[in-house]
Amino acid sequence: FGAGLTKRAYQLNVSAFLNASKQYLVNNDSWESNKFDLEEYSDEQKIIFCEGFRVIDNPLFNHLPFAPARGETLQIKTMVKTPMSNGSWYLPDGVGCALIGSTWDHENILSGPTKEGKNEIIEKCNFIKIQEEQIEEGFSGVRSGTRDRNPIIGVHPTKNNYFLFNGFGSRGTSTIPYYSKKMIDFIIHKKE
């Protein structure tokens, strides 16, 4: 079945972005690295819970239809410089490597990279030929998804100072800027 070519797309270096964001907050005395304890906050303070997949452990919101999923990717050595996708994807970095992926596993979310995941990725990325010696490293992460694949944002039904901003899954980097503005407008400007 062929593959599609991805043109004029951008890729966010999420690690670099998160590190720069953290440094900005540290520099502006707005970063705390303590374990969050709800008891330390008054009932008047507004709190936005953005916990990723760990929201499933939050007694305020764990009844909601969250469906975290572990995903795996591989970094391979390659000289192919064209991004491609056929449901799986291939993203070159321009310096002789590429990321390929990915998998979905709703059962073993904390297991890390697996041989089964590696084999699945290689099989699904059949639009490029991958030799074992090309594989440099396997990665895994947990998507904070929901059963219907839509984020869950809004106010708690009985505690109007607690808000939830979660469940973005694999589309978080592209949708969070839009939804964060909507959330701030809702909290600060009372816009729905």
Feature names for model-found ranges:
Residues 3-7, 100, 163-165:
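Generic recognition of long tandem-repeat/solenoid scaffolds
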Residues 79-159:
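Active-site lid/adjacent beta-loop-alpha segment flanking the redox-cofactor pocket in flavoenzymes
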Residues 32, 48, 163-165:
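Hydrophobic/aromatic beta-strand patches that form the interior of the parallel beta-sheet core
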Residues 10, 29-44:
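A conserved short coil-to-beta-strand element within the FAD-binding core of flavoproteins
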